[in-house]
Swiss-Prot record:
Residues 151-480 form the SAC domain. Interacts with IRS4 and TAX4. Controls the cellular levels and subcellular distribution of phosphatidylinositol 4,5-bisphosphate (PtdIns(4,5)P2). Does not utilize phosphatidylinositol 3,5-bisphosphate (PtdIns(3,5)P2), nor phosphatidylinositol 3-phosphate (PtdIns(3)P) and phosphatidylinositol 4-phosphate (PtdIns(4)P). Plays an essential role in a TGN (trans Golgi network)-to-early endosome pathway. Involved in endocytosis and acts as a negative regulator of the Slm pathway which modulates polarized actin assembly and growth. It comes from the Eukaryota. It holds the Pfam family Exo_endo_phos2. SMART domains: IPPc. Residues 936-946 have a biased composition (Acidic residues). CDD domains: INPP5c_ScInp51p-like. This is Phosphatidylinositol 4,5-bisphosphate 5-phosphatase INP51. InterPro entries: Endo/exonu/phosph_ase_sf (IPR036691), IP5 (IPR046985), IPPc (IPR000300), SAC_dom (IPR002013). Disulfide bonds: none annotated. Residues 872-902, 927-946 are annotated as: Disordered.
């Protein structure tokens, strides 16, 4: 990356790979109204992009050649002046993943430590000479005299890291093996990005440019996201046991300027001193990852100076009842990201106040239903006798597992489904010791189950050395802060409180015009979706499953679905006491079996595996028509355990989220609690899954346009065994369905609210004698039930079919399938790009011959209009200003809150409840009608006879 300073009209230009970005201070908008000027109080900067010309030959631009620039941190405003922050010194310290080529390790990606950062003013050239002529004396002046000196000193302290090709803000299990800027922007964890505030406006600007220019911007490699903490890779070259171990510690910014303060929780559940530490081990064939987190105790307390030896003591400011809300919010956030959370409290009570804190912590944890383990040993005792710690944490370590990826097969065969949340007070050493010992134990347990890799002495030495260095850097960071807390709080306030607005009228206009022309490059189309669920009882069958995958309505090639989503339960028999509870062979077997069917001999349509993942015995597979694959993006998954209170993989859910062009889909397969009487447990499983499954940027299940939720829900029929079997023979399915537990739960609005299930006209799918069509004849004589279900939600979905396959007999369940038609919105990216180019060319024709100020004035004119496209009307751009004009507040009296007798949305004396003059013993609601009562349907009556 190169940097130029514009001298005639002060500007900063960065250039890389034939692409330039120019930043220039905007004092006022030419032609703006007084109201716009009054509202535009946020300091503004104009940004322009253009192809790289030979700036060095232009006398207006001076290239800064005193150092090598490595990336853009963003824009910062201090005391009304704006500066461009760029990285000017780095060191390569890590490569989490690599390949062995010709017996040599070749890094697949790199992590860099930031050594120096420079700040270039958009206001004047006062400090330019210090930046253009490097010397120790000038560096000292930049630290002590430059307005951004404290920020420069902060970013240059050796604790900031970034990567161009590795999503450094997320743990390995949360990102794929492929990497690009689009992925990073969409999926990064902003709580660990220290320059998120500085780069936010550049990211917003990027969202407005065309896809073609986005690619140029990405290739230039300007945008850089930095984390703070510690990162390093150690390579152990030992023949077949060649391996690398990478440690990545990320200090959270969730508390902003109080990030490193010694204090408790905030009302919204944020804590200080929160650090996520991940170990990544890479071998020639496998990648392992394990994550732990530590932070301040999530309660309301403050530290006060003590006259005793220990220096500080704790004062609890709120009891467990008052603190419970914030405590719950903190752990809800952790659960949504990491899965099951187990507390490891390592504070040894030394006083009455610490004893009170420990009791309050215990009360809140028990109220929330979170396991808490108290470790009262010192760091030296733990180091000498690690078994004392590991014995107490053994169950959690086994149950949470570790992330594991088979490089040669290209499959994930284990996932970490929980995390240890370590709590400490005024200490970095003890949490680091606990994490080091747990990390070592996890690696030993994991590698014991992998035949091709063993832990060697050099590897374990490297592991311990990395943890020692991790402690040194984190302790150094914390100690520096505590020694001068007030100073650092001011620096963090500048970093997180800076506000700058980027102004680019050209791209704003193009973006707005494209929105108005949306109908010219978007269209709606129908795609077909096959959804199938099957509990296979741990079998690896040789039986043909063609009747399930290709029902009669899809038996011909031109009738095949565009998307196949397959959910399987009990694909493996789980063995307790294993770190890696997923058998990769089973997943490969089913992927190959189904893909072979879809791509049968003579078929012109070709299908590919779009995505798959497994949680214990639950497997979710997605296959898509190859011609539609290019329209799918932003694929990501999540898992949630519910078995044994969330501590085992025998029950739970696997979910995937993806966008088909502009329509967002979510597919889930789940296995809920078994047993006739366990309705409440199944309901709790549903609530846990619905609450815990989250995707990037906090996206939840309900936030999607179309949702398909299927699996072995284990709901039973509340009738006697004899009555159920008799009604099955006479095909009285409607009568059975009335007593179905899931049906009753949905009618009551308890489980799966807003979901729809098509009328069932097939016999119960559980439980059979395997290999026969006979319902259970064993000693238990289980009551037949519709345990296997498929539900849907979303206006874009229309269900066409809901059946089971009665002739696939190898399991004690029967496979169930549903066929949907989905109305999706498709964006023709090529046509959109063409239109964007046309708009750009027409605007540039109007601006030809004008200088920069005149161009901004023209584009800021409300009357600016460009000619029509393809017969459409002329298009006028909306009024633009760096800050949007807020709508005036209108005083409006709100109605009183609702009660049992009156609802605020029902007026004029109308009753809250409506009594229908229908005899429920004779009539029932017509199941063929749309579940939404406001959808008109003249063909079907509202009620029908039973």
């Amino acid at each position: 990356m190169r940097l130029f300073i514009g001298r005639r009209s002060r500007s900063i230009v960065i250039s890389s790979n034939n692409y330039c970005l120019s930043f220039q201070r905007l004092r006022s908008i030419p032609g703006a109204s007084s109201q716009q000027r009054q509202l535009s109080k946020t300091p503004s900067v104009t940004i322009k992009s253009y192809p790289d010309t030979d700036l060095s030959s232009d006398s207006n631009y001076l290239e800064v050649k005193s150092c090598i620039f490595n990336g853009l941190l963003g824009l910062v405003c201090l005391n009304g002046d704006i500066y461009v922050a760029v990285i000017s010194g780095v060191q390569n310290v890590g490569f989490p993943r690599w390949k062995l080529i010709d017996h040599q390790v070749r890094p697949s990606e790199s992590i860099y430590k930031v050594l120096d950062v420079d700040f270039y003013s958009l206001e004047n050239d006062v400090f330019d000479y210090l930046l253009c002529e490097r010397s120790e004396q000038n560096y000292d002046k930049l630290i002590h005299e430059h307005p951004c000196g404290p920020l420069k000193k902060l970013f240059s302290d050796g604790t900031f890291y970034y990567s161009r090709d590795f999503d450094i803000s997320n743990i390995v299990k949360n990102h794929g093996l492929s990497h690009n800027l689009e992925y990073t922007v969409d999926n990064q964890d902003l709580s660990f990005i220290w320059n998120a505030n500085l780069a936010s406006e550049v990211i917003n600007w990027r969202s407005k440019i065309s896809n073609e220019e986005k690619q140029l911007f990405a290739n230039a490699g300007f945008l850089t996201f930095v984390i703070r903490g510690y990162c390093k890779t150690a390579l152990i070259e030992d023949g077949p046991n060649t391996a690398s171990i990478t440690i990545i510690s990320r200090i959270s910014t969730e508390s902003k300027q109080d990030t490193l303060e010694l204090e408790g929780i905030s009302e919204d559940g944020r804590v200080s001193l929160f650090v996520e530490t991940e170990i990544v081990v890479t071998t020639e064939k496998f990648i392992f990852s394990y994550t732990q987190v530590n932070g301040s105790i999530p309660l309301f307390w403050e530290s006060v100076e003590s006259q005793l030896l220990y220096g500080k003591k704790i004062k609890v400011t709120k009891d467990s009842i008052e603190a419970q809300g914030a405590f719950d919010r903190h752990f809800d956030n952790l659960t949504s990201k990491y899965g099951v959370v187990s507390i490891v409290n390592i504070i040894k009570p030394k006083s009455e106040s610490q004893e009170k804190l420990a009791l309050t912590y215990k009360d809140c944890a028990e109220s929330k239903g979170i396991k808490i383990t108290n470790i009262e040993y010192s760091s030296s005792v733990l180091t000498k006798s690690p078994h004392k710690l590991l014995y107490l944490l053994k169950q959690d370590i086994y149950e949470f597992g570790a992330f594991a990826y088979d490089i040669s097969r290209g499959i994930y065969f284990a996932k970490q489904t929980g995390v240890l949340r370590i709590s400490a007070f005024d200490s970095i050493e003890k949490p680091n010791t606990v994490e080091r010992l747990v990390s070592k134990e996890v690696l030993e347990l994991t590698t014991n189950e992998i035949d091709v890799f063993e832990l060697t002495s050099p590897f374990l030495d490297a592991h311990d050395k990395l943890w020692s260095e991790n402690y040194y850097w984190l302790d150094r960071t914390y100690t520096k802060h505590t020694k001068n807390s007030g100073k650092y709080t001011k620096v963090y306030s500048k970093l997180f409180g800076s506000r700058v607005r980027l102004y680019d009228p050209l791209h704003i206009y193009i973006s707005q015009y494209l929105k108005q022309l949306r109908s010219k490059y978007t269209f709606e189309k129908d795609i077909s979706i096959f959804a199938g669920t099957f509990n296979i009882s741990g079998k690896i069958p040789k039986d043909d499953i063609k009747d399930w995958i290709f029902p009669k309505s899809m038996s011909k090639e031109d009738e095949m679905a565009d998307l196949y989503v397959i959910g399987l339960e009990e694909v493996v028999e789980l063995t307790p006491g294993h770190m890696l509870a997923t058998d990769p062979y089973v997943r490969q077997f089913w992927e190959k079996k189904i893909l072979t069917l879809l791509n049968g001999p003579g078929r012109k349509k070709k299908y590919i595996r779009l995505w798959s993942t497994q949680l214990g015995g639950i497997l979710l597979l997605l296959f898509m028509n190859e011609t539609e694959y290019s329209k799918v993006k932003h694929i990501e998954g999540d898992v949630k355990k519910t078995g044994f209170g969330g501590m085992a993989s025998n029950k739970g859910a696997v979910a995937v989220s993806f966008k088909y062009s502009a329509t967002r889909f979510c597919v889930l397969v789940s296995h809920l609690a078994a047993g006739l009487e366990n309705v409440e447990q199944r309901h709790n499983d549903y609530k846990t899954i619905a609450k815990s499954i989250r995707f990037s940027k906090g996206l939840r299940i309900k936030d999607h346009d179309a949702i398909i939720w299927m699996g072995d829900f284990n709901y039973r029929i509340l009738m006697s065994n004899e009555d159920v079997r008799r009604k099955i023979v006479s095909k009285e399915y409607a009568s059975l369905f009335e007593k179905d537990q899931l049906n009753q739960q949905m009618i009551a609005g308890e489980s799966f609210p807003y979901f729809h299930e098509m009328a069932i006209d097939f016999p119960p799918t559980y439980k059979f004698d395997p290999g026969t069509k006979n319902y259970d004849t064993s000693e238990k004589m289980r009551i037949p039930a519709w345990t296997d279900r498929i539900l849907s939600r979303g206006e874009v979905l229309e269900q066409l079919e809901y059946k089971c396959c009665e002739d696939i007999l190898f399991s004690d369940h029967r496979p169930v399938y549903a066929i949907f038609r989905a109305r999706v919105t498709v964006v023709d990216e090529q046509k959109k790009t063409t239109l964007g180019t046309q708009i750009y060319e027409k605007i540039m024709e109007r601006l030809e011959g004008l200088d920069d100020d005149e161009k901004i004035a023209v584009l800021s004119d409300d009357a600016f209009v460009i000619e029509s496209f393809e017969g459409s009307d002329s298009i006028a751009g909306p009024t633009h200003s760096p800050t949007p004009i807020p709508e005036p507040k209108r005083g409006r009296k709100l109605p009183p809150p609702s009660s049992d007798l009156k609802k605020w949305w029902i007026g004029s004396g109308k009753q809250v409840k409506v009594v229908l003059d229908v005899d429920p013993a004779v009539y029932m609601i017509n199941p063929k009608r749309d579940p939404n009562p406001f959808v008109e349907n003249e063909d079907e009556p509202l009620f029908i006879e039973r």
